[in-house]
Amino acid sequence: MTSYTEVIQDGMIRLLKSGKLTSASATAFSLSPEMLNEVNADMASYRERIVLRQQEISNNPGIIRRLGVIAMNGMIEADIYGNVNSTHVMGSRIQNGFGGSGDFARNGYLSILMAPSSAKKGTISTIVPMVSHVDHTEHDTQVLVTEQGLANLRGLSPKERAKLVIEKCAAPEYKPLLQDYLARSEQFSYRRHTPHLLTESLGWHSRFLRTGNMRPREES
């Protein structure tokens, strides 16, 4: 297995060390002090398996497309239709930059976005009715992954995607709430192609900011 990416971090060095990864191409390192010392101490071994390129090359959409990269990016949250927020907590506090994730998500042979299904000891669901900030649209997201499962969204209608994301990716404690939201959206939304209840779609985020929990009090 080889890696064509933007930044090499500790996990990739461990994969190289184990032999599971044979080579890695990137534009920079972002290593912990401990891992940096380890790499410097064994540079003769790594220099044959790591190449650093200009960002114009490492993030070049045409090269990413021609290589057939399987693009795997982390996310903060995804909504039931496949829109992804990878940079902003609660829609306004930036956690990290966008980086090259857009180049890889849009141009990779397969675009995978992943996160745990919940955060903050279960008080936050990473699968929500509507994301509070959009970095990757539903048109670029092909596969969503959490520890609960995998949702292959390719070729599906919005309502098919929503049902699959809830079934495969949502945390068990949030799944009934998402199913209820979708059912009521299908019944009461303005139009039914991509059902939403606009008075509720960002309500989970508002509830967390008020109470410290996305779940209603009687559910938590």
Write out the residue ranges for each language-model feature.
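Conserved phosphate- and dinucleotide-binding cores of soluble alpha/beta proteins
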Residues: 1-220
